């Protein structure tokens, strides 16, 4: 038997043990002070465990690990563990880009409350006629939010989806998805309603499409989104077209972002699912 790692959070350690059990690998978890040590019985499986552990440590709160605990019926570690604050949980799941966008978006929202929407939009709104060479505008409109509910809803989804993408695929991949979807969704919305709009929702819908389809095409991968959540997202999108919610919604941005995410996920998984 060989010691694999010691984790300070036994609940996360149990999640990894349960996940590896679904991969036909048995790990033994032993309490050691305030930590949980993981031991491997079959040393021939060490490389497989180390590879899975590396991915797990990038995104330990990914829903697939919780699903593994439900599948194996093991949710109680039997070990006393320290509690983590909301801030620690937030940082644990998110990478630097995820957190940076959240901080900047919140700062822009506060500035809008202090100086007024118009003054901030003068600098950050999608480019109007004659402003096309102000290149930041093609992306900065995603930072604009017009109500507390608007910003909370978008940042929650950005963290929930963008964090795992950055942890698993890297900051570069999340940056590409964010920039491409902001550009395309902004253009689509401006074509339909002019330049007076803002919000991260086009990027969020791109992440929804990307994570969901990637999980469907790579069931054994490390990114997934429950179909029930995807169904909710689609219902929300449809509701926006019927004005059921009683608020102004950037429907074109949502649709464009979703299409961008689906296309990027299809492209990224095409060679894996269709080997030559």
UniProtKB/Swiss-Prot annotation:
HAMAP family in the cross-refs: Rhomboid_GlpG
Compartments it resides in: Cell inner membrane
Presence of keyword Membrane: yes
Domain of life: Bacteria
Protein name per Swiss-Prot or TrEMBL: Rhomboid protease GlpG
Recorded family membership: Belongs to the peptidase S54 family.
GO biological process terms, semicolon-separated: proteolysis
UniProt function note: Rhomboid-type serine protease that catalyzes intramembrane proteolysis.
NCBIfam families according to UniProt: PRK10907.1, rhombo_GlpG
Any one Gene Ontology cellular component term annotated for this protein: plasma membrane
GO molecular function: serine-type endopeptidase activity
Catalytic activity: Cleaves type-1 transmembrane domains using a catalytic dyad composed of serine and histidine that are contributed by different transmembrane domains
InterPro entries: GlpG_N_sf (IPR038236), Peptidase_S54_GlpG_N (IPR022732), Peptidase_S54_rhomboid_dom (IPR022764), Rhomboid-like_sf (IPR035952), Rhomboid_protease_GlpG (IPR023662)
E.C. no: 3.4.21.105
Protein keywords: Cell inner membrane, Cell membrane, Hydrolase, Membrane, Protease, Serine protease, Transmembrane, Transmembrane helix
Annotated active site: 201 (nucleophile), 254
Organism from which the protein derives: Pectobacterium atrosepticum (strain SCRI 1043 / ATCC BAA-672)
Membrane topology of this protein: Multi-pass membrane protein
Pfam families to which the protein is assigned, alphabetical: Rhomboid, Rhomboid_N
Membrane-spanning ranges: 94-114, 142-162, 168-188, 193-213, 229-249, 250-270
């Amino acid at each position: 038997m060989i010691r694999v790692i010691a984790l300070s959070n036994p609940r996360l350690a149990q999640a990894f043990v349960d996940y590896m059990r679904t991969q036909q690998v048995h790990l033994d978890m032993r309490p050691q002070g305030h930590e949980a040590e993981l031991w491997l019985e079959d040393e021939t499986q060490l490389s497989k465990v180390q590879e899975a552990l590396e991915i797990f440590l990038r995104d330990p709160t990914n829903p697939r690990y919780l699903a593994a605990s439900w599948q194996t019926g093991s949710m109680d570690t039997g070990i006393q563990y320290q509690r983590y604050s909301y801030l620690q949980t937030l940082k644990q799941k998110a990478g630097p880009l995820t957190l940076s966008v959240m901080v900047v978006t919140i700062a822009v929202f506060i500035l809008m409350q202090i100086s007024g929407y118009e003054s901030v939009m003068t600098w950050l709104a999608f480019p109007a006629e004659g402003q096309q060479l102000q290149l930041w505008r093609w992306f900065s409109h995603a930072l604009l939010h017009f109500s507390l509910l608007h910003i909370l809803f978008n940042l929650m989804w950005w963290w929930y989806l963008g964090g795992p993408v950055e942890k698993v695929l890297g900051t570069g991949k999340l940056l590409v998805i964010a920039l491409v979807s902001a550009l395309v969704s902004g253009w689509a919305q401006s074509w339909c309603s002019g330049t007076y709009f803002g919000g991260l929702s086009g990027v969020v819908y791109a992440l929804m499409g990307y994570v969901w389809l990637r999980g469907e095409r790579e069931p054994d991968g490390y990114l997934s989104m429950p179909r029930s959540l995807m169904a909710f997202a689609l219902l929300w999108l449809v509701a926006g077209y019927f004005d059921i919610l009683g608020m102004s919604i950037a429907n074109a941005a949502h649709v464009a972002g979703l299409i961008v995410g689906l296309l990027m996920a299809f492209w990224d998984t095409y060679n894996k699912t269709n080997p030559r």
